[in-house]
Amino acid sequence: MRGLFITGTDTGVGKTEVTCALVANARAAGLDAVPMKPAQSGVAPGEPTDADRLHAACDGAEPLEVLCPYSFAAPLAPAVAARLEGRQVSFGAIVDGVRALAARHEAVLVEGAGGLLVPLTEEETYADLAVALGLSVLVVARAGLGTVNHTALTVEALRARGLVLTAIVLNQACETDDPSVPYNPAEIARVTGREPLARLAHVRDIAERQRFLRSRLAGKIQF
């Protein structure tokens, strides 16, 4: 299967923004790539969702419910949100759904929720999904204080499961005067053995930010 698994060191680090940029760049280059986000939570009626943005990034190449089969109201890990709603997330159905997309398209970019060890089902985490799909992993991390530890832990967890690290992207998702930001890329490279591919500065306007992300990531990540 051709594609990529996008995880984060935490929630709110910009996984969806990065995934949208990668999908849009791939499609602009002539590659039929689609995103897939198995589950999203914290969905409010009438409000735009991560799945909506991913759907737009691939020009509506697949129905929204195919690109994101599970949506939950509570802003919790999918397994917990499903439990509160009396529902179950089917790991097998998700794996089958990704493989079906891979059969119809040239590449599938699968976006997790939160971090690598977030419970997707009552038994499986997102790390288990990456293993089942055989996809290499892109880690999106915060740019600021604490990211060295969070990134190192994520890289250690994926390597322990035999997963291949494609790249680390440091994303400054909000404005900050954090003094650690200039030093974190080199320190992450030292402790993980992998230099972060890019440090993405904060851009307030959403449309302009997506253009910026696309330009910074263009041609840098292969899948």
Swiss-Prot record:
UniProt keyword list: ATP-binding, Biotin biosynthesis, Cytoplasm, Ligase, Magnesium, Metal-binding, Nucleotide-binding
A single MF term (Gene Ontology): magnesium ion binding
EC number: 6.3.3.3
InterPro entries, per the entry: DTB_synth_BioD, P-loop_NTPase
Cell compartment(s), UniProt: Cytoplasm
Disulfide linkage: none
Required cofactor names: Mg(2+)
Active site (UniProt): 37
Top-level taxon of origin: Bacteria
Binding-site residues for Mg(2+), renumbered to this chain: 16, 50, 111
A Pfam family per the record: AAA_26
Gene3D superfamilies: P-loop containing nucleotide triphosphate hydrolases
One GO term of the biological process aspect: biotin biosynthetic process
Gene Ontology CC, one term: cytosol
Pathway info: Cofactor biosynthesis; biotin biosynthesis; biotin from 7,8-diaminononanoate: step 1/2
Binding residues for substrate: 41
HAMAP family named among the record's database cross-references: BioD
Subunit comment: Homodimer.
Protein name from the UniProt record: ATP-dependent dethiobiotin synthetase BioD
